[in-house]
Amino acid sequence: MISYFLIQNIGEKSIEVDGARKYQRIDGFGGSGAYYEWLLKNLREPYRTEVADLLFSDLGICIYRLRAWTKIESINDDDDPNRFNWEAYDFTVDQDQVWNAIEAMKRGVTKFMASVWSPPAWMKSNLRETDDGYLLPEMYEEYAEWISAYILGYKKHHGIDIGWIGIQNEPDYTATWETCVYTPEQLRDLIKVVGKKFEREGITAKIVIPETSGIQKALRYIEVVMSDPDAARYVDVFAIHLYDIPFTNPDEGVSWLKAIASYCTRYGKPLWMTEYSYLDFPYAGTYEEALYTVQHIHNTLVYGNASAYLVWELFWYRETGLISISRAGDHYNVTPKYYAVKQFFKFISPGSIRIDAKSIDSQLLVSAYLDEKNNDIMIVVINRGKSDITTKIILKNITSIPLFKQYRTSRTEYCKYIGDVVAKDMTLELTFPSESITTLTTRKQ
C-alpha cells in the first residue's frame, strides 16, 4: 500500500534532509569473526549454510576483518629480510579463518582487512605473542618481510586479496591474548619500514593506523606519525575502536568523535571504526543491546564522519555476537543486534555519500545517504525514546523519485518491510514507534 501526504505547515518536530550538503563517502560496513572462526566452520548443516548466508549475504556487509596470521612464519625463514624464502613459509595453517573468508567471497564480500594482534613471538621482547612485549627494533625489517609475505601468500594460495592492513591492533593495550605494545614513536618508525617494503614488493594494501582501544589515545598516535613526512606518506586510513565510550551512554563519545573527525580533515584521511561491541552480559542478546549499538553507529557516522563501521563478534558462542553459535555446533540464534545493524548495513551501499539530515527532537536520531550512481536516497531514523513520535521529513535538493520503501526493527519486528510511502511536495509525515529503527530507501531491494 502506498500512502500520500500533503503537509502545509512545518511543525516543531520536523526532520530536514538536504541533498546539497555532502559529507564523507561510505567505504562500507563489516565485521570480524576473529578467534572463533571455527564455530561457523564446524556448525552442522544446514545451519552452517544458513548462518553464512545471513552474515555474508543478507546482512549486507562488504568488509571482513581478519587476524594477520603469525604461524605462516613460526620461525625465521632466514636471516635476510630482503629475501622471501618461500619454502620456509607455511600457508596450510589458519584453515578456519581462510574457510570463512572464502565463504564470504562466495557471497559477495569484496573487501578484506587484516589487523596484526601480535607479530611472531621470535620478533618480540618477551618471546611470546601473548601478554605485553614489544617489537624489537632490530626486527622491524623482519616484521615488514613477514607481513608482506602474508599479504602476497594469501593472495597466491587462497585467492584472498587483503586490501587494508592494520599495522597493530590496539598498540596501547596489553592483555592475556595476543598483543604488542608500541609507543607512538615506535609505531611511526615501523610504518616507515613497512611502507618502503610495500613499495619494493609492489604491494598496494592500504596501511591503517592506529586502531587504538579508544579515540582519546588515537589522537596522540596520529599526531606523532603524521608529523613525520617519511611516515605520513605511507598512511592511508585512520582507524579507531570505541572502548573508551560507555556502551550504555553513546553520547558521551560525541566530543571525541568530533575531535577525530577534525584530525581526518586536517590530514585528508578517511576514518574507519574497525572494532567495537558490548563485551558484558547483563544486556547481551537483548533488544537494549541492539538499540545502544545502532546509536553508536549513528554517532560514529554523523559526528566522526566515519567511512566504515565494523562490528566485533559477527558471530560468537555468547549472545554478544550478532549471531550466537553453540560450541557443540548443533544450533544458532540470531540476536536482535543483527537486525538492528542490518538497518544500516543492508541499505547503505559502498560509495554512497552521507548528506545532511537534522532532527529537532533529541530522541530522533537521523542520518541520510545519497547513492550518486543510482540517485537513490537512504534515511535511517532511530527513535530511542519511550514514546511514538509523529514527525515530518522535509526533502530539500533531492532529485530522485520520492517513493520510499520502509523497513523497521523494533521489539516485535526484525528489519521488516512495512510498506511504501510517497512524499507529496517533497514532504513525508511518518510515525516512528518507540525504541525503533526505521530505514527509508528509494532503492529497489
Q: What is the predicted role of each segment?
A:
Residues E142-W146, K156-H158, W164, P171-L279:
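Active-site neighborhood of glycoside hydrolase catalytic domains
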Residues L271-Q343, R354-S359:
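Aromatic/acidic polysaccharide-binding cleft in carbohydrate-active enzymes
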Residues K13-R21, E50-V51, D96-W99, A149-Y150, ...:
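Alpha-helical scaffolding within the catalytic cores
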Residues K396-Y414:
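Solvent-exposed beta-hairpin/edge-strand motifs
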Residues I360-P402, E435:
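Carbohydrate-binding surface patches
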Residues I15-G163, I167, Y182-R188, K192, ...:
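N-terminal catalytic cores of secreted or lumenal carbohydrate-active enzymes
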Residues G419-Q445:
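C-terminal beta-strand-rich structural cap/linker in extracellular carbohydrate-active enzymes
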Residues G31, F112, I165, F238, ...:
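Conserved, mostly hydrophobic/aromatic
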